[in-house]
C-alpha cells in the first residue's frame, strides 16, 4: 500500500510514540524527513536521529522527555498534499507566541519560522511543533 502523505505519517509516529512513552520510533527514511529530524534536534524537541543504511533506509528518532513528560506537546501538519499552505516573510506564524516553531520549506531549504524571518524568505509551512 502506498503512503499518501509521508510527512504526516512521520509526525503521527512521533506523536504516538511519545503518547506511549516509547524511547524511539522508526520509519522509512527520505531526505525531507531527515531534514525535519535535524531541525527538531537542533531546536531541542528530540534527543537524536539516525539513518540506517540498508536495502530500504530507515530513520530512527530518539524521543525526548523532561521529568517523565514528552517535550513535544503538539506536533501538527499544516500544508498537506491536498491543500498547500504558503506564507510570505511577513505572514509567517508565531507558534504559541514564539515558544514553538513552524517548519518552513523555502527556496534556501528547510528552516524554522525564525530563521526564515531573519533571511527575509517565505515558503510552504510544513508543520507546527510546540
Swiss-Prot record:
Protein name: Small ribosomal subunit protein uS8
Superkingdom per UniProt: Bacteria
Any coiled-coil regions, as ranges: none
Family per similarity comment: Belongs to the universal ribosomal protein uS8 family.
Protein's GO biological process: translation
Self-association and partners: Part of the 30S ribosomal subunit. Contacts proteins S5 and S12.
Keyword check for rRNA processing: no
Gene name in the database record: rpsH
Cellular compartments per GO CC: ribonucleoprotein complex; ribosome
UniProtKB keywords: Ribonucleoprotein, Ribosomal protein, RNA-binding, rRNA-binding
Tagged with keyword RNA-binding: yes
Molecular function per GO: rRNA binding; structural constituent of ribosome
Alphabetical list of Pfam families matching this protein: Ribosomal_S8
Stated role: One of the primary rRNA binding proteins, it binds directly to 16S rRNA central domain where it helps coordinate assembly of the platform of the 30S subunit.
Amino acid at each position: 500500500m502506498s503512503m499518501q502523505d509521508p510527512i504526516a505519517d512521520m509526525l503521527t509516529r512521533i506523536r504516538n510514540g511519545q503518547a506511549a512513552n516509547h524511547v524511539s520510533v522508526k520509519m522509512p527514511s527520505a531526505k525531507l524527513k531527515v531534514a525535519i529530524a535535524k531541525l527538531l534536534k537542533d531546536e531541542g524537541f528530540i534527543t537524536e536521529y539516525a539513518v540506517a543504511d540498508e536495502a530500504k533506509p530507515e530513520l530512527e528518532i530518539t524521543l525526548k522527555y523532561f521529568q517523565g513528560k514528552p517535550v513535544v506537546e503538539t506536533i501538527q501538519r499544516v500544508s498537506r498534499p491536498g491543500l498547500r499552505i504558503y506564507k510570505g516573510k511577513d505572514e509567517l506564524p508565531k507558534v504559541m507566541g514564539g515558544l514553538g516553531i513552524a517548519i518552513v520549506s523555502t527556496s534556501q531549504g528547510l528552516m524554522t519560522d525564525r530563521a526564515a524571518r531573519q533571511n527575509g524568505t517565505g515558503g510552504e509551512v510544513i508543520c507546527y511543533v510546540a
